[in-house]
Amino acid sequence: MNATAMHRIVELCLRLDNHASRLYLSLARNAGTQDLQGFWQDIAAKNEQHQLYWDQLLNWADKGMLNNLFDDPRKTLDELSGLEERVYDLADNCAQVRSKKKAFTMAFKLEFYLLHPTFETLSQYVATFNGDAGSDFSYERFVNRLFDALQQNELGTLELELVGEVIHRLWKENRRMAFLSNYDELTGIFNRRGLFNAITHLAHLAQRNENTVGVLMIDIDHFKAVNDNFGHQFGDDMLRRVAGSIREGIRASDVLGRYGGEEFLVFLPRVEPLSLGEVGEKIRRAIETMPDTRASVTVSIGIAHGHVGREVDADVKALIYQADEKLLAAKAAGRNRIEL
């Protein structure tokens, strides 16, 4: 059900993008000047270049790699369906627009509709795995182009400029909220939700490539005592520094997240089992020898590895459970150690 719902969500976003292209082409046909016609045509052409982006997301959706991206896919579907009706009507109405000012008003209205958080959530998800591949979706650059075109056509009225500024501010807030839904604000690494979204994606790739994957469960020893003796501000700083040390000890292709409290999880999407002990020991030593700290900081680490079969989610959960059991064994054996 989730894979089907996610396919429909991405498909709706693609259709909305296509309606936007149709609207901008209508504005181009009725622009009145060559410069303005070229401006609207260029925006429509850039929208049409997003096809590869949507094709990739549709492929991921069909493989179940987006299943945990939204809390309530049905609600998202309903909202996007209602949005499509409004955007479709707006694009139809643009066919008769001759006024330059009304053309920009219609463009801002369209972009207001397309501020639905789904677009930013998908954009940040793609950027996580494709680097800056979502840069064509740079909303900031796009809004700045609209502002420039307003000024060049002497249409920079207070009302239109205010609408543009509101849209820009709403986009920035959408971006911030999408980030916070997947990242831990304190440490800057994935939170539990973002962590599992990333792991699900990489686990599917590992299954396809038949790679061995690894899981490290890392827990700060006696963290409650640190908070009690030195205060929560010191404890927060320790969490940030431990997260930084772990990040420095793993590859860029590995995934690090805050699993909960003082516990961290590292997912290695491709690993040689014999090297896992070295990775764990490297992290343990780096944290034990962190400079400039008033309290002794050590961690216990549980490590598991295996292959991902057809039941991707179940296999990942089984590996995490195994790593957690190893972590408990490390604690029972005296802490500040790794267990394979």
Where are these regions (language model features)?
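Catalytic-core segments of nucleotide cyclases and related cyclic-nucleotide turnover enzymes
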Residues: 277, 306-339
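Alpha-helical bundle segments that constitute or directly flank the non-heme di-iron/ferroxidase center
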Residues: 1-31, 102-122
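GGDEF/GGEEF active-site signature
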Residues: 241-312, 340
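Signal-transducing coiled-coil linker helices
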Residues: 130-137, 141-186, 193-204, 254-255, ...
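Carboxylate-rich helix-loop segments that flank metal/cofactor sites and access channels
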Residues: 59-101
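Alpha-helical transition-metal enzyme core signature, strongest for iron centers
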Residues: 13-21, 40-54, 108-115, 139-150
